[in-house]
Amino acid sequence: MTITIALPSKGRMKDDASAIFERAGMPITAVGNDRSYRGRVEGWDDVEVAFLSASEISRELGNGTVDFGVTGEDLMREGFAEVDKRVEFCARLGFGHADVVVAVPEIWLDVETMADLGDVAADFRARHSRRLAIATKYWRLTQQFFSSQHGIQLYRIVESLGATEGAPASGSADIIVDITSTGSTLRANHLKVLQDGVILHSQACLVRARKESHADEPVVQAIIEAVRAAL
């Protein structure tokens, strides 16, 4: 069988992923011109490469239409419930670091932890006749973190279609759940991350779709071992 590896199609993620596969003895070349979205691995005739966006990679992995992919852990865990039953996180690759965090306005001086935020959420409806509004693109991770891990139920999620960090200032939400690398954008928008408000430390991962056909395919384990050895 042919094994398909989905890799980022552009930018730093593409360069970093390609460098790791190069070190793993799996040099990748595009098939056709530089704009091609197909590739091959030199010396690995039973492996093909598809160049996709990070969000496309996570979707194709979750649906099992590719065998391996390099994408952010945040995208996988947001995209699918019980994701570990669908995929295996084979290796964390050491690039694409970012945290999914809970951030509140800096002027909320008495809110430093999720417990503090729980108190605010409970009091919010009585004071404002509405639930605490959270702007985010990460509704699944937000629900799991607030409701399951911290027992906070009195909130509503506002889908963020643009710059999430601007939502509190614009009045479209009270707080946010967003991804950040340095925190500088949050600080520029007068937001602070709660002390225990990191939902996920994310980075780029080598992810394998769980397929029964992989059990009898030696190249699957060979790919995993080669990449791990290159880290």
Swiss-Prot record:
Into which EC class is this enzyme placed? transferase
What EC designation does it have?
Answer: 2.4.2.17
Pathway annotation: Amino-acid biosynthesis; L-histidine biosynthesis; L-histidine from 5-phospho-alpha-D-ribose 1-diphosphate: step 1/9
Q: Which Gene3D superfamilies match?
A: Periplasmic binding protein-like II (3.40.190.10)
* Keyword Zinc in annotation: no
What superkingdom heads the lineage?
Bacteria
**Reactions it catalyzes:** 1-(5-phospho-beta-D-ribosyl)-ATP + diphosphate = 5-phospho-alpha-D-ribose 1-diphosphate + ATP
One of the GO BP terms on file: L-histidine biosynthetic process
Q: Which InterPro entries match?
A: ATP_PRibTrfase_cat, ATP_PRibTrfase_CS, ATP_PRibTrfase_HisG
Q: Where does it mainly reside?
A: cytoplasm
Among the entry's GO cellular component annotations, what is one?
cytoplasm
Q: What does this protein do?
A: Catalyzes the condensation of ATP and 5-phosphoribose 1-diphosphate to form N'-(5'-phosphoribosyl)-ATP (PR-ATP). Has a crucial role in the pathway because the rate of histidine biosynthesis seems to be controlled primarily by regulation of HisG enzymatic activity.
Written domain comment of the UniProt record: Lacks the C-terminal regulatory region which is replaced by HisZ.
Similarity-based family: Belongs to the ATP phosphoribosyltransferase family. Short subfamily.
**Protein name, please?**
ATP phosphoribosyltransferase
Whose protein is this, by species?
Answer: Rhizobium etli (strain CIAT 652)
Per the record, the gene is hisG
